[in-house]
Amino acid sequence: MLVSTAIAKLAGFACPTVMVAQVRCALMTEAVIRQAEVADLAAIALLRRQWTQEQGGASDDPGFDERLVAWFARESSRRIIWLAEADGRLVGMMNLVVFERMPRPGRAPSRWGYLGNAFVLAAYRNEGIGDQLLRALLGYADEEGFVRVLLSPSERSVPFYERAGFGPADGLMLRTPPQMTDSVPRST
């Protein structure tokens, strides 16, 4: 039995039609997506601590908050952080580092971005929050005329980014400093 698109949307499903016996789409949570401000640093710190815990790291670092504040002060002129708010709290984030190429004669400098630090709280995953964050970030990049957006996805996130049009990038190289080992994750 098929359910109409209108009923599916009212029920919170993110797909045009739904088979009652076999639901193949995710429940959607509408989030407010906005750019971060200094006042959001405490909540960003909580999200970052949660990400660290999920990666198996210790989140009880007493100097972390001060380092985050200093990092934000340095990075805020070239980095845009999008936040997702749902149920009265921040539940996700994603950011874009903005790069501008050096101008050359006869050509204006182009801009490109590096997408990083994408994270949604476990209780809000698979509800469309990541998609809403990504649409906001890519919408900004498109409006600003970015020539490309790069990222280094986790294995689990590859299908998510592929659905948004990302694919393998030829012509890129990576150097890992000699003191780093393969046991150190390359994700951010």
Residues covered by each model-derived region:
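Conserved beta-strand in the GNAT
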Residues: 83, 89-98, 114, 119
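Conserved acetyl-CoA binding element of GNAT-fold acetyltransferases
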Residues: 106-122
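Conserved acetyl-CoA pyrophosphate-binding loop and the N-cap/start of the following alpha-helix
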Residues: 124, 128-136
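A short beta-loop-alpha structural element at the N-terminal edge
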Residues: 32-46, 57
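Conserved GNAT acetyl-CoA-binding A-motif
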Residues: 141-153
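Active-site rim helix/loop that mediates acceptor-substrate recognition in acyltransferases
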Residues: 59-81, 95, 102
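Conserved catalytic-core motifs of GNAT/GCN5-like acyltransferases
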Residues: 98-104, 150-156, 162, 167-183
